[in-house]
């Protein structure tokens, strides 16, 4: 397990591989509180599919797998498995609530093309 803690008071030897925004962490915390299960963590993953070849997925998980990278932010944990890690390194995971609706958004510098749906990409 790889652990990354994002906080102003902690200095890490390497830069965080992802940006997990305050808005995303706060929304995850709200959803976990609504579920009433403090052991839940947000798992972000990449799988084959979508109109551009790959698509993002989000789910709650209680378990941390051996190959997971764990990021702690504002009292919640973000999990990314080793296969997805290579496609998400450098990405920003955010939460937006605007005229287009409310959703988690990934800004991925590794994506060479994206689909209009916003959840499909290619590298």
Swiss-Prot record:
Pfam families: Fe-S_biosyn (PF01521). Coiled coil: none annotated. The keyword Metal-binding applies. The keyword Metal-binding applies. Keywords: Iron, Iron-sulfur, Metal-binding. It comes from the Bacteria. GO terms for molecular function: 2 iron, 2 sulfur cluster binding; 4 iron, 4 sulfur cluster binding; iron ion binding. Iron-sulfur cluster binds at residues 51, 115, 117. One of its GO terms (biological process) is iron-sulfur cluster assembly. HAMAP family: Fe_S_insert_ErpA. Required for insertion of 4Fe-4S clusters. This is Putative iron-sulfur cluster insertion protein ErpA. The gene is erpA.
